[in-house]
Amino acid sequence: MSESQKKVIVGMSGGVDSSVSAYLLLQQGYKVEGLFMKNWEEDDGEEYCTAAADLADAQAVCDKLGIELHTVNFAAEYWDNVFELFLEEYKAGRTPNPDILCNKEIKFKAFLEFAAEDLGADYIATGHYVRRADVDGKSQLLRGLDGNKDQSYFLYTLSHEQIAQSLFPVGELEKPQVRKIAEELDLITAKKKDSTGICFIGERKFRDFLGRYLPAQPGKILTVDGEEIGTHQGLMYHTLGQRKGLGIGGTKEGSEDPWYVVDKDVENNILIVAQGHDHPRLMSVGLIAQQLHWVNREPLQGTLRCTVKTRYRQTDIPCTVTALDEDRIEVRFDEPVAAVTPGQSAVFYLGEVCLGGGIIEQRLPLQS
């Protein structure tokens, strides 16, 4: 079958990246249709407006490009497979990454299945800044060409089979080029700002949002020396390395340096803080990760020299990875790293290739 007969369903979010993705695929000769996913049942007016506006933008783009737009409601799947897990992690004092879960459970599972089974798609496409390469009959996940926008960190749970069914047209471009194409086509999304915030929950204030689902659990804020200097409303509102929102100033006789969260004592509901962003207590020499996903589906044997990111947009850290068993690895950094956060993902790279990753179960502190 030539590309001209192959059918691609593009996940249309109402943003510029998916809009341009649809256009590029049409240019490449595919039969293109769009799909707008509704993944959250709104419970307030503001959020409803955002979702409605995004759908209207997606529809306007599809009309302009002359393609059909389907809609689907994955709110139940999102609640069961993303949101409940997200809350569980927060309750346990960890800091999960919902975008990674959402890509795993919704965009490259529910959407992929729906597109193939209900819409007869050969491929799905998204506006992610990643690339794929096919080597020896297996698809690899590569970083996006635009280093500032590369989103491979969020897609490490994909298997080579899922990548083989996915196209990422804007991954070959830099963001300014994408905006330029949208402007030349006079697409309504050309100047729309990039969405931030939790995938599908949008820009609302995170603390207020979390407070609806998890009761406040006030506790003490202690310094690394054990001095009590304040109270927190719940460990879930704080992440390692955070300095905003602690509500504490300098101590009477101490320095005026800002305070940073350096640890959470989940058992005793205590938030531990120190002054200075590079306090030794905040540094880790490595980590243990679990719930591993390797893109090539082959568990790690022995050790591996590669680089790792412990959060999005971090500079790659050279490291040595050692398999502890089939589902746990130990990672040792060449140099200590600040704010390695349990619940977040550690994602591994060999050059341009994203190998996979896992959830940080614990950090290996420089000093405890």
From Swiss-Prot:
UniProt keyword terms in alphabetical order: ATP-binding, Cytoplasm, Disulfide bond, Nucleotide-binding, RNA-binding, Transferase, tRNA processing, tRNA-binding
Keyword Nuclease assigned: no
Region Interaction with target base in tRNA: start-end pairs: 97-99
Name the UniProt record assigns to this protein: tRNA-specific 2-thiouridylase MnmA
Its EC number(s): 2.8.1.13
Protein family (similarity comment): Belongs to the MnmA/TRMU family.
GO biological process, one term: tRNA wobble position uridine thiolation
Subunit structure as annotated in this protein's UniProt entry: Interacts with TusE.
Cysteines joined through disulfide linkages: C102-C199
GO MF annotation terms: ATP binding; tRNA binding; tRNA-uridine 2-sulfurtransferase activity
Region described as Interaction with tRNA: spans on this chain: 149-151, 311-312
Role, per record: Catalyzes the 2-thiolation of uridine at the wobble position (U34) of tRNA(Lys), tRNA(Glu) and tRNA(Gln), leading to the formation of s(2)U34, the first step of tRNA-mnm(5)s(2)U34 synthesis. Sulfur is provided by IscS, via a sulfur-relay system. Binds ATP and its substrate tRNAs.
UniProt key word Disulfide bond: yes
One Gene Ontology CC term in the entry: cytoplasm
